Amino acid sequence: MENEINDLTNEVNELINPDYMDDDELQGIVGAEIDDAIDFIDNTVSPIRAKATEYYRGEPFGDEEDGRSQVVSMDVRDTVQAIMPSLMRIFTSGDKVVEFVPHGPEDVAMAKQATEYVNYIFQKDNQGFLVMHSAFKDALIRKNGVIKFYWDESYETQTSELTGLDDMALATLSGDPTVSLDIVSSYPAFEQTEEMAMLGQEAPLLHDVRATRRMPKGKVKIEAVPPEEFLIDRRAKSIEDAQLVAHRRVVTVSDLVAMGYDRDEMESLASDTDEMDMNVERYTRNPALTTSTADRTDKAMRKVSYIEAYIKVDRDGDGIAELRKVCVAA
């Protein structure tokens, strides 16, 4: 149904504006930009960052000779470890990572409330200390520390088995827009009597149902992004002037369904392999991530490559490229 609505919307837009870009053309442009950014990160940037990780760990260079010293200098690690406490102290030595300053007496209460709220969101609700620590360390070792903040529009799903519901209870539950029902079985509440049979009356039905409640669980999310998951246009001088900025990651079908995507469509895209296993930076940083001990048989936990892209594109044909968010799953 959703695809039919999108197709109809595209047809209407094309009739109104012949220069309007349809979904297929947009998908082609986004796909080409993403492929180019992946090639840039995986083949140009990641090998350099992987080498920096090896220097940090003091791993052998591979040119050692028998009878010669095998000692590797740990200068990179020592320098990073010496800088980290000072960096963390700047932001975490006090109780307030962020403080809002009032412009006048009337703003004092609001500024205090905003300060308490933002600090709670960052420090308590999102483990701000660990977020900063990860990003700072990535920046010192791998030249890039990425922190992502956004409103997480995830949903919480709860499934319950309910038995013995009468018609009124079933109707009440069916009227709840957050609940979807699957009737498992229906049966008479009691045996039909002879008198009821003579009057043509039937015994009321009881129902056993499976109820799935889907509730929004939105919150501010702040997280450190592994450098190899961050994609950017190779021509960009900064995030602001980049034609494409994207976050790629491997998620499960369950994660995507919780985001609101169609279950059947996501299951058709799932696989048992991880496309990022070939990234040398990821392997160097944590070889265990590329080692699979067992494949999950349940479809909900199968893997899907998910890319959240922000791209500048002129879709409405007015000659001005707008920033658009396009999410791609494969």
Give residue spans per PLM region.
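Extended, helix-rich architectural segments
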Residues: 1-330
